[in-house]
Amino acid sequence: MSPKHFLDLSAVTSADLRTIMNDALARKQAFKAGTGDKPLAGKMLAMIFEKPSTRTRVSFDVGMRQLGGETLFLSGTEMQLGRAETIGDTAKVLSRYVDAIMIRTTEHSRLLELAQHATVPVINALTDDTHPCQIMADIMTFEEHRGPIKGKTIAWTGDGNNVLHSLVEGAARFGYRMNMAVPLGSEPKDHYLNWARNEGAEIMLCHDADRAVAGVDCVVTDTWVSMNQEHRARGHNVFQPYQVNAALMAKAGNDALFMHCLPAHRGEEVTDDVIDGPQSVVFDEAENRLHAQKSILAWCLGAI
């Protein structure tokens, strides 16, 4: 039987994603009530970090432990994936030792090669192309605050990066409309836009932040230059019109939420009054990485 990988939102059915989402919402409530279960007792998760991250490491480590399992941290320098040993061979060996593998890496092809050869589930904790765990946390956060996300409109303003790619895939899988405003030359990859549109998603891409956020239910942004993507930096003057500030938020819906995956560069992509304001749910997002990923782990390992 093939392992249940969590590689991208496009690679998991809408029904399975909804199962994971509903489990995450229920699992968080149970955890808060002190009635959470430990369905992954005796299981071991290998965590490979070729790109560092505080939130990802802590949330997966704590999440696995809350489910009764254990974790093994492996840094990029320790692993030397594809250098000292092929990625395929590493995947086969790790599969003999652990029950699941989480990887945060650079090229998306490295994730896919690992999953191709692994005989245990592989989870995408981030690549340069996508960040599906973050979007599961974002959708969970939206639904906690505003109810079902289906039929709602989400706006993105800023760089066409990996978080946006997964947000676009989420539009097809969860049924929300997606508006995007990015500078010329910073558009998301056509592959993700075309896939989502072919799946029936309502996608609007423009270069005008005011147009993208008009009347929307949620405004999302991220850093203007992602980690290890400094070669794409184009200067703050290019991105300044896409800053999320009070004036831009005023053009969104009256009860629109503001989201950011963090860490944020305050005063750049978002102003203090927005990220610290009443519409901001950024720390709920960060918290929900823990609970969303617990349900992803449980789904991959057959516990839901």
From Swiss-Prot:
Residues annotated as binding carbamoyl phosphate? 53-56, 80, 104, 131-134, 261-262, 289
Q: Which GO terms describe its biological process?
A: arginine biosynthetic process via ornithine; citrulline biosynthetic process; L-arginine biosynthetic process
Q: Catalyzes what?
A: carbamoyl phosphate + L-ornithine = L-citrulline + phosphate + H(+)
Annotated PROSITE patterns: CARBAMOYLTRANSFERASE
**Which positions in this protein are listed as binding L-ornithine?**
162, 222, 226-227
EC number per UniProt: 2.1.3.3
Localization of this protein: Cytoplasm
UniProt record similarity statement? Belongs to the aspartate/ornithine carbamoyltransferase superfamily. OTCase family.
What is the protein named?
Ornithine carbamoyltransferase
- Which organism is the protein's source? Rhizobium johnstonii (strain DSM 114642 / LMG 32736 / 3841) (Rhizobium leguminosarum bv. viciae)
Report which gene this protein is encoded by: argF
